[in-house]
């Protein structure tokens, strides 16, 4: 379900409330690289406040594609994380509800948040599979 909605979102490219900021930051990174402060957006703001990872990925792949891939990946990771602990039916229901939430964030353009959720889920999954060092690194990456 999430993959279908993400593909439609990419294809139709609807305007979303938060997408403009992510497109701006990605384009800015593409022009000047990492920057701490920018005066061109509503009188100035600090760029690292949203994400250190999203602008370079957005500049490389495009903000919409990064958001769509993060949405799909987070649903897959969530399902893998809960599968060992719940029945197949409960896992499926939880994954569908999680996908609905992820799709809502995608539709409004909260792309940096979606990428952070994906990295956070990677961290928790690594910890659940007894890879504490990987979980630590991903947890730190999630916080940036």
At which residue positions do the language-model features occur?
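Helix-to-loop transition at the C-terminal end of transmembrane segments
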Residues: 8-21
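Early transmembrane hairpin of solute transport permeases
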Residues: 39-41, 56-92, 97-98
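Transmembrane helix interruption/hinge and helix-loop junction motifs
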Residues: 13, 60-64, 87, 109, ...
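Short hydrophobic/aromatic helix or loop-helix immediately within or flanking a transmembrane segment
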Residues: 31-65, 142
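Hydrophobic residues within the alpha-helical transmembrane core of Major Facilitator Superfamily
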Residues: 7-8, 57, 65, 96, ...
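Membrane-embedded helix bundles of polyisoprenyl
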Residues: 72, 76, 80, 90-130, ...
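Start-transfer (signal-anchor) and selected internal transmembrane alpha helices
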Residues: 1-7
């Amino acid at each position: 379900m999430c993959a279908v909605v993400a593909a439609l979102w990419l294809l139709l490219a609807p305007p979303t409330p938060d997408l403009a900021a992510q497109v701006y930051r990605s384009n800015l990174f593409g022009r000047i690289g990492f920057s701490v402060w920018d005066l061109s957006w509503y009188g100035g703001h600090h760029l690292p406040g949203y994400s250190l990872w999203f602008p370079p990925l957005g500049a490389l792949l495009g903000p919409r594609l990064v958001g769509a891939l993060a949405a799909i990946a987070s649903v897959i990771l969530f399902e893998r994380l809960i599968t060992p602990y719940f029945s197949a039916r409960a896992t499926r229901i939880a994954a569908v509800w999680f996908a609905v939430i992820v799709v809502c964030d995608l539709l409004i353009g909260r792309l940096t948040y979606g990428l952070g959720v994906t990295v956070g889920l990677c961290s928790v999954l690594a910890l659940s599979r007894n890879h504490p060092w990987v979980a630590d690194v991903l947890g730190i990456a999630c916080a940036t």
